[in-house]
Amino acid sequence: MAGLHFFPALLALLMASLQTHQGFPMPSLSSLLSNAVQRANYLHNLAGDRYRDFEQNYISDEQRHSIKNSPAAYCYSESSPAPTGKEDARQKSDMDLLRFSLSLIQAWISPLQILGRPFGSPDAYDKLLDLEKGLQVLMRELEDGSSRGLSLLKHTYDKFSANQFSEEATLKNYSLLACFKKDMHKVETYLRVMKCRRFPESNCTI
């Protein structure tokens, strides 16, 4: 009889162990996705702040007008099949949205590895790596093979230049910051679309 009384406790212990990995509880899909959205939002806001600060301090009205109408304003991500807005994103599967997001994040890892004056945020690179890892975990959780072979972004961006006395370097940094802001906005949008689709009850805003 003592063995029978012990059995429910043993069963509960075994069930709990199945929900852990290396002694730590595995986060729920909702938590993983919420963390990814928070990191994407942080990077998007950071990129927007740095872009506006840089524009105010280094870019004249004439330069601003000329660069927005030049090939320098082109972002690599515009050559990918990634959705261009939330309505387009809603037509994609969750796995596609994760893969698009991961490709955009990875395109910026090298440029942000060595940060110069134009960006000036030492935690940006770490946040980018955290988000990359978070997206990879989400993809493993949802892996179904449906998105294999999807053509994604193949380029990475140039590194930021620390030379603020060269007009060429200044315009290059301005263009890079503009692209970084656009790409982080895309990543945040994709992840919010995915979160709202899977967990509509969880403070869902896009």
Swiss-Prot record:
Similarity remark: Belongs to the somatotropin/prolactin family.
Gene: gh
Location, primary (coarse class): secreted
CDD domains in the cross-refs: somatotropin_like (cd10285)
Identification of the protein by name: Somatotropin
Cystine residue pairs: 75-179, 196-204
Keywords from the named record: Disulfide bond, Hormone, Secreted, Signal
Function: Growth hormone plays an important role in growth control and is involved in the regulation of several anabolic processes. Implicated as an osmoregulatory substance important for seawater adaptation.
Localisation: Secreted
Single GO cellular component term: extracellular space
Signal sequence, renumbered to the chain: 1-22
SUPFAM superfamilies: 4-helical cytokines
Keyword Amino-acid biosynthesis carried by entry: no
Protein source organism: Protopterus annectens
Single GO BP term: growth hormone receptor signaling pathway
InterPro entries in the cross-refs: 4_helix_cytokine-like_core (IPR009079), Somatotropin (IPR034975), Somatotropin/Prolactin (IPR001400), Somatotropin_CS (IPR018116)
